């Protein structure tokens, strides 16, 4: 075998090895890296600290921390902002709503005078900002519970179209109007 044949054979082997390496990178490394970046991004943008980075959310994070769902309960369990304020019925809905809400909040924070937002009026539309699927993620045994049985039975049977926060209005943010006043927002 002359040197040209050996060189040609080596080039073919290197070509095959290159294809295998690129295939492994494309099939294993890139998806794993994308998953890790995505997972870390979701985790980093899901806690109360991230939400309170925007000054306008401070009264809501504080009033949440002062509530049963913020950890003021016998078990010390605390819900995150995303537990209640994002849908948990599917990963797709969670992802798209997280993206939509995030873009909206950044836009409002950057290009609006947030001191002019009537936060009290927004609390009257809490059904638009809280998802029953979030409530039911934690309260998995609610359908079998005996407290409020008639109302909950009607809810699960679809007889009423109320949402959880229709009846449980201040459950996630205790004394929210007080916190809004302390942060100099219009109640």
Regions found by a protein language model. Give the residues of each.
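Short sequence/structural segments immediately N-terminal
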Residues: 2-187
């Amino acid at each position: 075998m002359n040197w040209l044949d050996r060189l040609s054979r080596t080039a073919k082997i290197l070509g095959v090895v290159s294809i295998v390496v690129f295939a492994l990178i494309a099939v294993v490394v890139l998806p794993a890296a994308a998953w890790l970046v995505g997972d870390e991004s979701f985790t980093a943008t899901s806690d109360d600290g991230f939400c309170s980075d925007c000054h306008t959310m401070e009264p809501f994070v504080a009033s949440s921390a002062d509530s049963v769902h913020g950890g003021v309960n016998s078990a010390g369990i605390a819900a995150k902002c995303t537990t209640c304020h994002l849908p948990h019925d599917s990963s797709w809905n969670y992802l798209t709503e997280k993206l939509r809400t995030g873009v909206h909040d950044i836009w409002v924070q950057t290009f609006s005078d947030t001191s002019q937002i009537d936060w009290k009026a927004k609390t009257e539309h809490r059904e638009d900002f809280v998802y029953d699927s979030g409530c039911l993620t934690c309260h998995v045994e609610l359908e079998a519970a005996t407290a409020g049985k008639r109302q909950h039975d009607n809810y699960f049977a679809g007889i009423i179209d109320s949402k959880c926060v229709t009846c449980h209005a201040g459950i996630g943010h205790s004394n929210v109007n007080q916190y809004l006043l302390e942060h100099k927002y219009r109640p």
